[in-house]
Amino acid sequence: DLAFWIHTDSLEPKYEKGAVVLIKQTYYDQAGAIYAIDFDGQTLIKRVFREANGIRLVSLNKKYSDQIIPLDEEPGVIGKVIDGFVPLNLEEIK
């Protein structure tokens, strides 16, 4: 299993920029779940829906538009997001 840093605000309000999400390596098995997708050399973490012409990636933050990736462009499922957290800033604790 894997962990990824979130570098944008596209998953807010659930996961803020700077959070870490935990990924269970699996295949696509649940419409609307949040997945890590490998596409064109990038890892995209979005809510995923299977469409007739591809997969639809949906940000949780409504300011972003949906993205359709055609299946012939071979997007790959890395795994499903199972949890997330914001790491502690140890300097703030001292």
Predicted regions located by residue number:
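Acidic/glycine-rich C-terminal interaction modules and beta/coil loop segments
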Residues: 1-94
